[in-house]
């Protein structure tokens, strides 16, 4: 009976004026895991709701922290709309080790095109395209966490 249903169902739908595309793609990961491309490039400071800025910490040039805004080169980032990466020179914001757990650290790492380096803006949030989780500045370091609407997950782009 299944082959008959397969043939009859499209005919029945067409008779009722309902036309379906040849292929339907369903995202089974749910609405919290969408990763649209950014609408345009953004650059400059990335400010937290607390008025601090994302900053490269210390001499290792990998650790990211929140710090008083001063507009120097170590606080200037660029969101590349084409690749979905947030860059600081030739390095990208990277969820360390490709982790997806809450609290996984976000560092600067050589850009490599992997999903753990792709991000998108969602209102004032910056979300990982890999996990759908939000960039979070709750601790002194940056991490990803399940999006919860807190001010630690709200960021503003621009300025120097």
Q: Where do the protein language model's features map onto the residues?
A:
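Extracellular glycan-recognition/adhesion modules and their associated mucin-like linkers
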Residues: 18-60, 76-100, 118-141, 157-160
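A detector of repeated loop/turn-to-beta-strand junctions in beta-rich toroidal repeat architectures
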Residues: 61-63, 74, 103-105, 152
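C-terminal motif of bacterial Sec signal peptides marking the signal peptidase cleavage site
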Residues: 14-15
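Short, low-complexity, Pro/Ser/Thr/Gly-rich segments in the mature regions of secreted, periplasmic
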Residues: 146-160
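Short coil/turn segments at the loop-to-beta-strand junctions that recur within blades
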Residues: 71-73, 112-115, 149-151
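Sec-dependent signal peptide recognition
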Residues: 2-9
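Aromatic-rich beta-strand patches that line glycan-recognition/binding surfaces
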Residues: 63-68, 104-110, 142-146
């Amino acid at each position: 009976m299944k082959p008959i249903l397969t043939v009859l169902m499209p005919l029945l739908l067409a008779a009722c004026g309902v036309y379906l595309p040849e292929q339907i793609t369903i995202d089974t990961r749910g609405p919290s895991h969408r990763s649209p491309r950014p609408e345009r490039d953004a650059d400059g400071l990335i400010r937290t709701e607390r008025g601090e800025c994302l900053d490269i910490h210390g001499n290792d040039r990998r650790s990211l922290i929140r710090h008083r805004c001063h507009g120097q080169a170590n606080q200037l980032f660029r969101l590349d709309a084409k690749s979905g990466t947030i860059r600081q020179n030739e390095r990208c914001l990277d969820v360390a080790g490709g982790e997806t757990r809450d609290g996984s650290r976000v560092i600067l790492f050589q850009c490599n095109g992997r999903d753990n380096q792709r991000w998108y803006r969602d209102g004032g949030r910056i979300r990982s395209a890999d996990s759908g989780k939000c960039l979070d500045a709750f601790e002194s370091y940056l991490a990803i966490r399940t999006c919860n609407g807190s001010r630690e997950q709200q960021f503003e782009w621009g300025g120097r």
